[in-house]
């Protein structure tokens, strides 16, 4: 299984998301199950390297959010219009 390190997001909104992206990170969200949705931030380069692996979109992934492991699947991916960059990912708990 693929493991991705994540951190809980502090800021919300467009400005906070832009600051994340300029720092080489991007926002994401984990939802589903009986727990409340969690906004997280991911390192762009590490996720981009994992994305090219077979099974990233179809298999169960492990997100390590501040040390707590959560099993998720990729629900939706948003990309930059013309740059090869990820701008947001939705994960759903398994």
Curated annotation (Swiss-Prot):
GO terms for cellular component: cytosolic large ribosomal subunit. It holds the Pfam family Ribosomal_L25p. It comes from the Bacteria. The keyword RNA-binding applies. One of its GO terms (biological process) is translation. Keywords: Ribonucleoprotein, Ribosomal protein, RNA-binding, rRNA-binding. GO terms for molecular function: 5S rRNA binding; structural constituent of ribosome. Part of the 50S ribosomal subunit; part of the 5S rRNA/L5/L18/L25 subcomplex. Contacts the 5S rRNA. Binds to the 5S rRNA independently of L5 and L18. This is one of the proteins that binds to the 5S RNA in the ribosome where it forms part of the central protuberance. HAMAP family: Ribosomal_bL25. This is Large ribosomal subunit protein bL25.
